Amino acid sequence: MTMITNLKRSFTLENIRELAKYLKGFIPNIQDDETLLSFLDAMYTHDPDDNFDILYHGFMFRGISSNLLLQVENIDEMSYASWSKDIDVAIDFASKQYAWHQYLLIRYGWAIDLAKVKTIALNQFDAPTGLENYNPSREKEVIAPLIHSECVILDISGNNRKPVEDFEQSMRI
């Protein structure tokens, strides 16, 4: 059983409502419950034709190819500058193609403080491509800190970083 399965099962209606309240404050287009529910539903929907799976690769924009990041191998050896550039490219692409998405909820493979989180595996949970020498022991070392304390809301401009303190506790597994 993957941590993703555990995380998904750990979400109660109360947890979702807390997350929803927080997201409403940061995503301008979410003005009603119906839109919000659609947004939340998308976060747990895998569409192979769209090459889009928020849950497996962090909360990502619809239409961004997961391969944009998964094609990177040996992430441990990548420099901060190179890794940052790849993230910026993805964010820039998203902002142009899907401007209504104002913010990204960063989890799992997307890390903001790369000085603190040195090693990130984007495919640690059943992803079809990516790191060939992924060590499951890194799940606890790298992913757990992201789940428990490194969740952030990232302004699409990349200039505004806000800790997700309002619902951090409810997201713990």
Regions found by a protein language model. Give the residues of each.
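Conserved NAD+-utilizing ADP-ribose enzyme module
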Residues: 1-55, 73-81, 85-173
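Short hydrophobic beta-strand segments
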Residues: 54-67
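Short aromatic-glycine-(Arg/Gly/Cys) micro-motifs in beta-strand/loop hairpins
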Residues: 69-71
